[in-house]
């Protein structure tokens, strides 16, 4: 279902698991290549515009979400995590109070959980990461007794 610039899937998961994706509309970025709702400071957009776009997201989301620093690789990180920077292309958590967040442009966002909602994972799947096994790596980390 599409509501403004937020898209939510219609999937059968526990009520406390939420997934949303933004589109490129209704934002503050004025350069046409960003299509107005850019959320990344890594692509040459005006930082003020990105901050205004981010404020829109934060006004509709819990305070406890973290962006990872993506690099088109295969690294997976468990949240919450105090290391900085959080360099990975996937994150997961077993904590119901933590939000897994990724950014995508032309890459595939993958969100996975189980029918109990015992974990959630957000995977940034570009062609490089797919070739390096980012999905398999995320599933293996989630299933590992010592992540």
Give the positions of each predicted feature.
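Short acidic/glycine-rich loop or secondary-structure boundary segments that cap or lie
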Residues: 30-31, 76-77, 129-132
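Glycine- and Gly-Pro-enriched alpha-helical subdomains that act as flexible
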Residues: 111-147
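Generic secondary-structure signature for well-ordered alpha-helical cores
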Residues: 27, 59-62, 144-147
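Conserved nucleotide-ligand handling architecture
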Residues: 1-21, 25-26, 60
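One-carbon transfer enzymes
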Residues: 3, 9, 44-48, 55, ...
